[in-house]
A protein has these predicted regions:
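Class I (Rossmann-like) S-adenosyl-L-methionine-dependent methyltransferase catalytic domain
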Residues: 1-35, 73-142
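Hydrophobic beta-strand segment of the Class I
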Residues: 39-44
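Hydrophobic adenine-recognition pocket in adenosine-nucleotide-binding enzymes
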Residues: 48-51
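Acidic-and-aromatic substrate-binding clefts and catalytic sites of carbohydrate-active enzymes
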Residues: 53-55
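A short glycine-rich, Lys/Arg-flanked "PGG" loop and its adjoining helix->strand segment in the class I
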Residues: 58-73
Length: 142
């Protein structure tokens, strides 16, 4: 029987999903001490990219990919800067809503840039979803 390790990377205000091994972000780093490289069949990191400064987002994705086994899937997500900006300019986000979002993130990136980072690491994009200003990208390591 194949060992299926499903991991969820969580922030301090995020609920744990049953059936996933929870890995927390501590001191600005993902605590992967107990996870070997190429061990995970599925990594759910759909709300974490905003936690890292812009200069560390690519490194974060690289760390996630190292833990993913061949055939494994990765889901990453964050706040899309371009969509956020358009929503502010077009009045779809009120100033207080925009301010709340800005104060809750360390950085914002755009979906295209993150998809390119993922492709650079030889993963295949399976799906991209956008809801409001949040995006999620699913990819597979082949």
């Amino acid at each position: 029987m194949e060992n299926k390790m499903k991991v969820q990377i969580t922030t301090s205000n995020q609920e744990h999903i049953a059936g996933y091994r929870e890995i927390s972000i501590k001191d600005g780093k993902i605590d992967f001490q107990e996870i070997s490289d190429n061990e995970c069949t599925h990594i759910l990191a759909n709300n974490i990219l905003d936690v890292f400064p812009a200069q560390q987002v690519k490194l974060c994705i690289m760390e996630l990919v190292k833990k993913l086994r061949l055939g494994g899937t990765l889901v990453v997500g964050g706040t899309d800067l371009r969509i956020f900006s358009l929503n502010v300019i077009n009045g779809m986000l009120q100033p207080n809503e925009a301010s709340d979002i800005i104060s809750s993130v360390s950085s914002m990136s755009d979906t295209g840039t993150i998809a390119n980072f993922i492709r650079e690491m030889n993963l295949t994009i399976i799906n991209t979803q956008i809801g409001g200003v949040h995006y999620e990208i699913s990819a597979e390591r082949k």
